[in-house]
Amino acid sequence: MKLLAVTVLLLTICSLEGSLVRRQVEEQSLQSLISQYLHIVTDYGKDLVEKAKTPELQARAKAYFEKTQEQLTPLVKKAGNDLINFLSSFMELKTQPATK
């Protein structure tokens, strides 16, 4: 009976130690995966900064913003005029009943 109890105790201890070792390995692999991911993201960010410094990209971005501004300016002016007309129609509605 004592032999059986000692055997069960040893098996339990070995099982617990094995699971502990597996957890430590999983944590280390997760940490290395995260550090590798952060390293890749950092390198990618550095590459983007270097590419953004090129004059060609800056010229393309400037041309894009100028083109967008040219297209949006008339739309914004029209929307402003429409809003003023809309609000003034409400003002006219309020003044009509007062004059009667």
From Swiss-Prot:
Signal peptide: 1-18
One of the record's GO molecular function terms: cholesterol transfer activity
Pfam families: ApoA-II (PF04711)
Subcellular location: Secreted
Key words of the record: Cleavage on pair of basic residues, HDL, Lipid transport, Secreted, Signal, Transport
Record's keyword annotation contains Glycosyltransferase: no
Keyword Plastid (UniProt): no
Record-level GO cellular component terms: spherical high-density lipoprotein particle
GO biological process: cholesterol homeostasis; cholesterol transport; lipoprotein metabolic process; positive regulation of phagocytosis; protein stabilization
Record-stated family: Belongs to the apolipoprotein A2 family.
Free-text function comment from the UniProt entry: May stabilize HDL (high density lipoprotein) structure by its association with lipids, and affect the HDL metabolism.
Oligomer status and interactors: Monomer. Interacts with NAXE and NDRG1.
PANTHER family noted in UniProt: APOLIPOPROTEIN A-II
Protein name, UniProt field: Apolipoprotein A-II
Lineage: Eukaryota, Metazoa, Chordata, Craniata, Vertebrata
